[in-house]
Amino acid sequence: MDILSLGWAALMAMFTFSIAMVVWGRNGF
């Protein structure tokens, strides 16, 4: 795995995590 793929995977993980935080926040979690 090269650095570009690793960086892209990390970016996608952070994006998904931030969306999960927003959803949980709106649900009162």
Curated annotation (Swiss-Prot):
The cysteines covalently paired via disulfide bonds are none
Membrane-related topology note: Single-pass membrane protein
Q: Which domain of life is it from?
A: Eukaryota
**Record note on quaternary structure:** The 4 large subunits of the cytochrome b6-f complex are cytochrome b6, subunit IV (17 kDa polypeptide, PetD), cytochrome f and the Rieske protein, while the 4 small subunits are PetG, PetL, PetM and PetN. The complex functions as a dimer.
Task: Please give the function described in this protein's UniProt entry.
Answer: Component of the cytochrome b6-f complex, which mediates electron transfer between photosystem II (PSII) and photosystem I (PSI), cyclic electron flow around PSI, and state transitions.
State the family named in the UniProt similarity comment for this chain: Belongs to the PetN family.
Q: What protein name applies here? A: Cytochrome b6-f complex subunit 8
Q: Which organism is it from?
A: Porphyra purpurea (Red seaweed)
Cite the source lineage: Eukaryota, Rhodophyta, Bangiophyceae, Bangiales, Bangiaceae
